[in-house]
């Protein structure tokens, strides 16, 4: 069918090329001329500045009073150790801040795997090197890991109370974003006789705590929510008060079918009226194991799939289900 030159095109072809577990290339076409850069730049800025993540924000090392110190028997100085701590890829399931400990002595390499973890903390890059010890070396430290968004300088977190007890507690500039690299190119596209169209190719790499495809979805959702205010824009002279629900992660509103579980696991969940991911994460392991025909193998599968999306069982949602999620929707989920 001939497409009119006056018809405003919307993208009809989306291709996701998985380069590695942490990198993907997403192609979107066709786009009207100029929209490749418009959308590419907007998504790039959101991905770099607005993706939530976790990072080490404070370190307390035995025998160290300030970052310009050196530790006997440790090859790296304190500044190098702090820089290495910034490279940790950490996921917190259900908490906004935790304190972790690391203790090692004797000759060898200190890696992220040497950090003692709580049950709801995961380090995606356990082979990441933190320091190298000589035979007489020892490294003992406490690490504070927090959840945040974007980039946060250390001095922005300090209060008057912190100033009085900051000796030995080393503050780190924190880059919370799970996005390591984002680039986009705009190529030519063609639809029938129209040759002046755009094709947007996004090359995205994360630190492994967030799937690249999910990062794109979240960035697009943020952009959509911000632009929604302009859709119903009116020239009212009086300010309009908009009642807004507490923000809920869009992934929680998606059906459990999107998790691509085995048929057995999916059917067991639906038999328990678990239709949405938000329903699922509020269940505990004990509750799920009471589900008929759902055994430990299915439970492990569910936990692994949730963990790959930064979620876990036993999480608490204060405003679930949201008003926008109607009960009769579940009948068709």
From Swiss-Prot:
Could you tell me what reaction this enzyme catalyses? RNA(n) + a ribonucleoside 5'-triphosphate = RNA(n+1) + diphosphate
Its EC number(s): 2.7.7.6
User: One MF term from GO for this chain?
Assistant: protein dimerization activity
GO terms for biological process, alphabetical: DNA-templated transcription
Which superkingdom is the protein from?
A: Bacteria
SMART domains in the record: RPOLD (SM00662)
Keyword terms, alphabetized:
DNA-directed RNA polymerase, Nucleotidyltransferase, Transcription, Transferase
Q: Name one GO cellular component term.
A: cytoplasm
Gene3D superfamilies, alphabetized: 5' to 3' exonuclease, C-terminal subdomain, DNA-directed RNA polymerase, insert domain, RNA polymerase, RBP11-like subunit
* InterPro entries registered for this protein in UniProt: DNA-dir_RNA_pol_insert (IPR011262), DNA-dir_RNA_pol_RpoA/D/Rpb3 (IPR011263), DNA-dir_RpoA (IPR011773), RBP11-like (IPR036603), RNAP_asu_C (IPR011260), RNApol_insert_sf (IPR036643)
Q: Where is this region: Alpha N-terminal domain (alpha-NTD)?
A: 1-234
- Ranges where the record places region Alpha C-terminal domain (alpha-CTD): 248-333
> Into which EC class is this enzyme placed?
transferase
What is known about its subunit structure?
Homodimer. The RNAP catalytic core consists of 2 alpha, 1 beta, 1 beta' and 1 omega subunit. When a sigma factor is associated with the core the holoenzyme is formed, which can initiate transcription.
Entry function:
DNA-dependent RNA polymerase catalyzes the transcription of DNA into RNA using the four ribonucleoside triphosphates as substrates.
Q: What is known of its domains?
A: The N-terminal domain is essential for RNAP assembly and basal transcription, whereas the C-terminal domain is involved in interaction with transcriptional regulators and with upstream promoter elements.
Say which family it is in.
Answer: Belongs to the RNA polymerase alpha chain family.
Matching NCBIfam families: PRK05182.1-2, PRK05182.2-5, rpoA
Protein name (Swiss-Prot/TrEMBL): DNA-directed RNA polymerase subunit alpha
Species this chain originates from = Pseudomonas putida (strain ATCC 47054 / DSM 6125 / CFBP 8728 / NCIMB 11950 / KT2440)
